[in-house]
Amino acid sequence: MLTNLGSLHAIAACRGDGLRPELARLLRGGANAFPTPGETKMSREQENKALVGRWFEGFWGNPWNPQIIDELAAPDMLLQYSLHAPRRGRRDVRSFMLDFRAAFPDLKFWGAADLIAEGDYVVGRWEGGGIHTGPAFSDFLVGSLPPASGRKMHFTGTTVLRVENRMIAEEVGLDDGVTALTQLGILKAA
């Protein structure tokens, strides 16, 4: 059972080291993989956690996998975090991440605790960040960065994802945006 996002890098390589066969197959074969005869079918919560684990690793990890958007994001997916305006749909989500990663080429987030699942919802705690070495970035709700500011951000958050028809329908996160914006020099500490 997938329990810790911190080990996703090894899992994503799909070596199957110590993984239950159905989880290794799910990670290799995507959300439509099914157990072979004799294997126990994963619960909906287990499937949803595995799907969210693949999403976190592919979308927020480094290197990122742009194809993960077409593979796992619902066509009208909602992506919403306190630092940025809400994004809706695959094209908008892709555009957001392309701009974010151009500005922060080393951007990476990883799991800080076990995933929790209930029904269609999966909750994950994470941490991460990056150094702004790319073009000017103005996607924050307040302020912007000039080109290659060299400023570093490292912060944490908690995200609630809703899975619908084996796709990520919503990703809504609460992050420590004040810390990130202060580190980037956009907000001034009191």
Model-derived features: positions:
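Residues at the start of alpha-helices and the adjacent loop-to-helix junctions
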Residues: L2-N4, R44
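C-terminal and inter-domain tail/linker signature
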Residues: C14, L23-L26, N32-A190
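Generic early N-terminus positional signal peaking at residue ~5-7
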Residues: G6-S7, E47
